[in-house]
Amino acid sequence: MSDHTARHAPQSPASHPTRLEIRDEVIRLGQALKLANLVEDGADARVVIEAGLVQVNGDPETRRGRQLHHGDIIEFSGEAVKVVPADR
């Protein structure tokens, strides 16, 4: 007997990211991870970024000071966050 159950590829977190609203034009990657509550503090941000565990727009990023702009997507630990302008 064949299995006719529909199988779907798992959705990547980047397909439905949560929003990270920022007031300025740019934010540094380490700050964004903290603001999005993806890490506890700057030390944790440094460790996970330097270990290559964080992706920006689908590419591994190892620079904590990487500047993110509106529209950039951060992925870490199964979560995705999109940098967007804050409502004024």
Short names for language-model regions:
Residues 51-59:
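Short, structured beta-strand/loop micro-motifs enriched in basic residues and often containing a Trp
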Residues 48-49, 68:
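Short, well-ordered loop/turn sites that connect or cap secondary structure elements
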Residues 1-35, 60-63, 67-88:
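Ferredoxin-like alpha/beta domains used as RNA- or RNAP-binding modules
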Residues 45, 54, 71:
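Short hydrophobic/aromatic patches on the structural cores and recognition surfaces of FHA
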